[in-house]
């Protein structure tokens, strides 16, 4: 019975790691894309119209792409840590992944609550003098989020690789 329970736990840990790796890859590459093409500059300066409302899920808003998957990032990393706790070789990587994912989630929560409403969703675009300091802060916090998602993704990938090698 212990072997079956252990087998189920390993199966569950593998599945959770797969979900965590996918969701963190989505998060990292989405964050990278936002920086490279300066999505915040575009969305912050866009005038509201019938076709392009200034809303979290309006056309052009990254919210549409993150909403389905983003809420599972930190929970998946934490669940992977719990499910894989019995594997000493991958435990440190899972700890790093959970901590990094939680850091990224906290940075995201800060942006969503403190910066994004004024910067992106006010009825009209802010003046340049009001917009530029918010954009600067947004990019600084986003750098933390990008680094956290990269570290979490790399740690999850390493934990998954170690688990696969141990079956070898």
Predicted regions and their residues:
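Core segments of transmembrane alpha-helices
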Residues: 67-81, 145-153
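Hydrophobic alpha-helical transmembrane segments of integral membrane proteins
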Residues: 97-117
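Interfacial segments of alpha-helical transmembrane regions
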Residues: 10-25, 83-104
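Short hydrophobic alpha-helical membrane-entry/anchor segments
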Residues: 33, 82-89, 110-113, 158-168
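Basic/polar N-terminal segments that are highly enriched at the extreme N-terminus
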Residues: 1-15, 163-168
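Eukaryotic polytopic
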Residues: 135-142
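Terminal transmembrane helical module of multi-pass membrane proteins
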Residues: 143-160, 165
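Interfacial loop at the N-terminal end of multi-pass membrane proteins
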Residues: 4, 13-15, 23-73, 118-135
